[in-house]
């Protein structure tokens, strides 16, 4: 209960900070109406966003409504928010995708178009393989890639996504970047394909 109270306090501060970040003319009794929170992805991001919106709604006394705006690795949601009024009533459940969408040319603006108001969670992508492969280390995977003379199929969220960039860096360091075929599955689908044996490995967020 103590941790819950601390979290609620942090979220209240975060929402208040959004007021000062997005609007120079907002009133002290903010919010006077519902706040719309853009959610860019499904999976873990959506789960956390739903919990966060419930807590914020309770603390602020106004509905904080999560709205899914998926697509383009986050580009759809970021573009919407960037054009919305800077009055504190439009916020986004952000992620590192703001960097990848900019550098892959999907949006003409970068993270400086927004001001972060709170860090709620952190998550690191995980590389997983089907246990039937018998691989238990990166060395095992490297040996398999070099031995079969073919390509390894690796599931990612999408081309240019953070999972794609992470896996590219890993496989480059392993010396097998030329033996990888990337398959884009969107949010949370790669682990299912991995368990079904249709791909050799997947890089996804642990929550998925």
Feature annotation, model-predicted:
Residues 12-21:
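Bacterial N-terminal signal peptides
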Residues 157-166:
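Secondary-structure junction motif
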Residues 28-113, 151, 159, 173-208:
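N-terminal (or domain-start) structured segment
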Residues 2-13:
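Bacterial N-terminal signal peptides that target proteins for export
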Residues 115-154:
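A conserved helix-loop-strand patch within extracytoplasmic ligand-binding domains
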Residues 99-106, 120-134, 168-173:
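Periplasmic solute-binding protein
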Residues 48, 166-168:
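Hydrophobic alpha-helical segments in the ANL/AMP-binding
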Residues 22-28:
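Sec/Tat signal peptide C-region and signal peptidase I cleavage site
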């Amino acid at each position: 209960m103590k941790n819950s109270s601390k979290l609620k306090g942090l979220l209240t501060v975060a929402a208040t900070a959004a007021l000062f970040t997005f609007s120079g003319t907002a009133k002290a009794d903010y919010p006077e109406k519902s706040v719309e929170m853009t959610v860019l992805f499904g999976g873990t991001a959506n789960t956390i966003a739903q919990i966060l919106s419930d807590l914020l709604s309770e603390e602020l006394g106004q509905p904080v409504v999560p709205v899914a705006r998926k697509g383009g690795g986050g580009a759809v949601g970021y573009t919407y928010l960037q054009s919305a009024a800077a009055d504190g009533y439009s916020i986004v459940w952000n992620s590192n995708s703001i960097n990848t969408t900019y550098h892959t040319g999907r949006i003409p603006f970068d993270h400086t178009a927004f001001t972060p108001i709170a860090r709620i969670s952190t998550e690191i992508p995980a590389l997983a393989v089907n246990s039937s492969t018998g691989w238990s280390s990166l060395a095992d995977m490297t040996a398999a890639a070099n031995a079969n003379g073919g390509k390894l199929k690796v599931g990612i969220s999408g081309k240019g996504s953070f999972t794609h960039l992470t896996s590219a860096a890993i496989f480059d360091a392993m010396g097998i970047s030329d033996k990888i075929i990337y398959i884009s599955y969107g949010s949370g689908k790669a682990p299912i394909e991995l368990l079904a044996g249709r791909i050799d490995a997947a890089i996804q967020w642990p929550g998925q």
